[in-house]
């Protein structure tokens, strides 16, 4: 621990496992207390991987507490603005302030353009785009009230800079997040709040499960010209959650104090292919 985030509090969504858990543990190791939420329950029917569980969220709590930091956790859906606002309010009352927001929660669903239904399009947009907006709106005023600025990090995707074949809804939602970060940065900068988006490529999480990979492979059999659209420059195709957490922690720290409205890829170069 180097104390880069000492005396700060971070609000993290989708914190039960994967990238969200990695963000929580990494920030705790750097001295931050954590407000952690996750749906920890059933995901929409278009999602091909298992949802997180309350036990997953409890494990995140255990790992954060093992660092010696405090954590407030709650089972909350990012589509529930009032629920998020209540969790943040409770967390600030108990932990004293809010300095960092990490809007990490999101879903993906491999579907060809003509297989996407109005329901699945709405589900992906509601969780990824509206859920991100809800997250920022639930916490931004608390950062302002703290009086010393802060950092908001929106987790987009390589698809939010380029595109992901066979995921029109996911691509649209992640581009929305990219634009949202810039727009929030423009208005929140007067309060010394920085807002940036992070754009991972493939990451070793439940979202990258064998079922997901198999579904995409089936699609590329019928559209082979799209098979290599996200080929990386580096020899590593799949990052670990901790790799993304390194970047997110840096954006939360004073080391990135002059960086805002930036879209930062952590994608092994795949968005440039």
Tell where the protein language model's regions lie, with residue ranges.
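Substrate-binding pocket helix/loop in short-chain dehydrogenase/reductase
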Residues: 112-113, 117-122, 229
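Short C-terminal tail/terminal secondary-structure segment
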Residues: 162, 235-236, 248-249, 260-273
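A conserved structural motif in NAD(P)-dependent oxidoreductases
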Residues: 232-244
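Residue(s) in the substrate-gating loop at a strand-loop-helix junction
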Residues: 157
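Active-site helix of classical SDR
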Residues: 136, 173, 181
